Amino acid sequence: MTRPLLSPEWVARLKQFKKLIVGFSGGLDSTVLLHVLASTPPLSNQLLAVHINHGISGNSLNWQRHCEQLCLDLGIAFIAKAIEFDRSANVEEAARNARYDFFSSLLEDNDCLVLGHHLDDQAETVLLQLFRGAGVDGLAAMQECSNLGAGQLARPFLTCPRVELEHYARIHELKWIEDESNQDTKYSRNYLRHRVMPLLLEKWPGVAGNISRAATHCQQAKANLEVLAIKDCPDLLNATDHLLIEPIKGLEFERITNVLKFWLKKNRIQLPSSKTFHRIIHEIIFAKLDAMPTVSWNQIQVRRFQQHLYLLKADQINLPKAIKWQQFPASLTYPDADIKLSAVKAQKGLMIPKDAQIEIRFRKGGEEIYWHGQTKHLKKLFQEWQIPPWVRDRVPLVYINDQLACVVGYAVSDLFFTTNPLEAWSIVNNS
């Protein structure tokens, strides 16, 4: 008697979620997964199948229609999404990132994304990471359960070999899509699947399970390293985009690297190379006190100001441009610069004259504001407020009729300040 693909433990675990979003490509793995979930009464009414149309194959629309029809037959809610991604570099990675970004955007609290990855997929992932020279994090490969966006990600088939999924599909006479690109060995995973794994299986029939078990050992080692990182630097528990340097300077090189890895992962940053970690430690952490060095990779920057490391992402590096706030007090958003301004009524604060022209600008140098009874240079105020230099260029400046009226989050000009709650506004940057 064959074991069920979905164990009672998995049924109990998945039953706790409000909604189960199934990544449904229409291939063997996701077709079996969807059928198993739809055939499990405690779970069948929680399902939403999501098909991602990458637009790579000429058959994409036919695949989408196939998936929609199967969901109609099973009585499962279905949505399809065509995604855009950069096709100039690593197509596999770019498509994967775009796919997970969309899945993440769908997840709400107590939702779970369920994917059909199986044991053979896990073995391939471990080998691909090994060939890239990955460390413990990479060799830990895919986890059965992890966080994703506001919800969770589950892979209930991760210990099931592909042959068990094929057996289930034959018994239930399921039809699935065969993506022709899966045979193209120019893609690394396909090369491994069609050229390398058959040789390994010929010599060691149980090799996929053994490799997968090694990933489990690496996951435990990864968890232990994360515990060590918090022990070495308790500030990690509260750290966001900045990290105090002093507590880690006395650690050994490897343990500093471990702390940095934890910090970057917490901020959802793909880990850089060992060479980059070496540069962060030697060029930034152990730099002179008055130095402000920078290390960059993949549109990410790590910088230093005073006794802190600062992490900057792409939308924090791009400098925003001036824009008129024509719909004041409606919110104003800079989608490419991680800035969202809102105006809220206040007991005291910024006064906006009737029919005023409001414009949001950013520092270029030479700005002055009349504040606390004096005309002050904005540059000196930024220094007094101990704002890191690269942040200064991104602090929104509210100009009213061409006069600097407010430095958002820091100061309101005396010329535009009021204590009348009927007239006062507070400008808030919600980024």
UniProtKB/Swiss-Prot annotation:
Its main location: cytoplasm. Pfam families: ATP_bind_3, TilS, TilS_C. ATP binds at S25, G26, G27, L28, D29, S30. It catalyses: cytidine(34) in tRNA(Ile2) + L-lysine + ATP = lysidine(34) in tRNA(Ile2) + AMP + diphosphate + H(+). It comes from the Bacteria. One of its GO terms (biological process) is tRNA modification. GO terms for cellular component: cytoplasm. One of its GO terms (molecular function) is tRNA(Ile)-lysidine synthase activity. It is found in: Cytoplasm. SUPFAM superfamilies: Adenine nucleotide alpha hydrolases-like, MesJ substrate recognition domain-like, PheT/TilS domain. SMART domains: TilS_C. Belongs to the tRNA(Ile)-lysidine synthase family. PANTHER family: TRNA(ILE)-LYSIDINE SYNTHASE-RELATED. Ligates lysine onto the cytidine present at position 34 of the AUA codon-specific tRNA(Ile) that contains the anticodon CAU, in an ATP-dependent manner. Cytidine is converted to lysidine, thus changing the amino acid specificity of the tRNA from methionine to isoleucine. This is tRNA(Ile)-lysidine synthase. The gene is tilS.
